[in-house]
Structure formats: structure tokens, C-alpha cells
């Protein structure tokens, strides 16, 4: 049966919640925190491995950050290959699964990507400075041409680090200096962190920053 009193109470509760939400939105509308997005190929949550246990949490700080913030999982059909396709999925919201069989986002005409809303593009429209760092060269996926359509103010690859790192710019042997930043076979995540700090020190006083790094 229709309960008029119950429905009226429910509507009042909804109205109260909406008013509270509007007040929260108004109070945070002017906040523009710096945002850093990192896709790291060298990190994963080892506690999610099936059948593996640890006496102590090896990622206690990471899990603490997850608990006090917003966290979740991202699912992709790519595993062990096609890293740039995963990047484009995240930055554009497009899913490789729905493309024609045998095609990937990386094979798109760069001009086609320009018509879609993107994460860096939305930040750019909101008044952010947007920068992309890749800890390798541009010899595989043609990232420079593809990502130039996504809304980045500037992009930096291994051959461009002197534009970010003052020590690299002053080094007598540029590539020799970069060799000191290698851990294993590739440039370390620690060096990516240093470069983010350099970008913040160069541009952080002007506008809020969106920094995207791929290792």
C-alpha cells in the first residue's frame, strides 16, 4: 500500500542529503590539489598472489594509504605486453576490448584521439599544467605522436631528461649520467620520483599540476 507519510519522510531525507552534498561541493569547488598518476611496471601488490603468505605485511605503508584514501582495482585484458594500450585505456576511458579484432588503441590515428575527452585534457581545461614522463625512449609505441593529442603541455622521454633534471643538463656526459639512474635494466622508479620533484619545483608555483609517469 502507498504510505504517504513514509514517502514524505524519505523525500525530506533525500532533500537534506542533497543540500549537504551541495554545501560540501561549494566548500571544495575551489580546491585544486596537485595530482600524480604513475603506471609502474616494477610494482605490484604481492599480497594478492594466491597461496603466498607473509609473517609481516611487506607493503604496510601502501596498504595504509589505501585504507585512508580511495582505492580500487583496474582490469585490463593486456598482460605482459601492450603497456601503451593500457595507458591509453586509462587516459581516455576507451577499452581495447571493443575495438575491431586485431587492432589496439596504439594503432589509432593520433587525430582520432583528439576528439575524445581525456584525463589530462580535463585537467588542462580546469586550469592545470599537465606533464608526461616516460622512463624510456619513444622507439616502440609512437607515444610522442599519440599522447600529443591527449592534452599534455609537455612530454619527456629519456632523451629529454635534461629539460627536467638540472644535473642532467649540466652533466658533461649526458647518457653517462643517466646510466647512474638505472636499476637493473631500466631507469629506476626512484629517478622518476626525482623528476617529479624537479617538475614541481619548476612549475608548481604557477598552476596546479597533473603529472603522469610511466616506467
Show the residue positions of the predicted features.
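Solvent-exposed soluble domains appended to multi-pass membrane proteins
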Residues: 12-33, 37-40, 45-215
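Conserved functional hotspots at enzyme active or ligand-binding sites that engage polyanionic ligands
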Residues: 4
Amino acid at each position: 500500500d502507498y504510505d504517504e507519510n513514509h514517502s514524505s519522510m524519505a523525500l525530506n531525507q533525500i532533500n537534506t542529503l542533497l543540500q549537504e552534498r551541495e554545501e560540501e561541493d561549494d566548500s571544495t569547488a575551489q580546491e585544486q590539489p596537485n595530482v600524480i598518476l604513475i603506471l609502474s611496471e616494477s610494482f605490484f601488490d604481492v599480497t594478492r598472489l594466491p597461496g603466498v603468505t607473509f609473517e609481516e605485511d611487506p607493503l604496510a605503508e601502501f596498504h595504509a594509504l589505501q585504507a585512508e584514501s580511495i582505492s580500487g582495482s583496474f582490469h585490463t585484458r593486456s598482460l605482459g605486453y601492450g603497456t601503451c594500450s593500457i595507458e591509453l585505456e586509462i587516459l581516455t576511458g576507451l577499452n581495447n576490448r571493443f575495438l575491431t579484432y586485431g587492432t589496439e588503441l596504439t594503432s589509432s590515428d593520433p587525430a582520432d584521439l583528439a576528439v575524445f575527452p581525456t584525463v589530462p585534457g580535463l585537467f588542462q581545461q580546469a586550469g592545470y599544467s599537465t606533464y608526461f614522463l616516460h622512463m624510456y625512449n619513444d622507439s616502440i609505441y609512437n607515444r610522442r605522436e599519440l599522447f600529443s593529442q591527449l592534452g599534455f603541455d609537455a612530454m619527456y622521454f629519456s632523451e629529454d631528461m635534461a629539460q627536467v633534471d638540472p644535473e642532467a643538463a649540466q652533466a658533461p656526459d649526458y647518457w653517462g649520467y643517466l646510466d647512474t639512474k638505472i636499476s637493473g635494466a631500466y631507469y629506476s622508479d626512484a629517478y622518476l620520483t626525482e623528476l617529479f620533484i624537479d617538475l614541481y619545483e619548476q612549475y608548481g608555483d604557477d598552476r596546479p599540476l597533473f603529472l603522469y609517469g610511466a616506467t
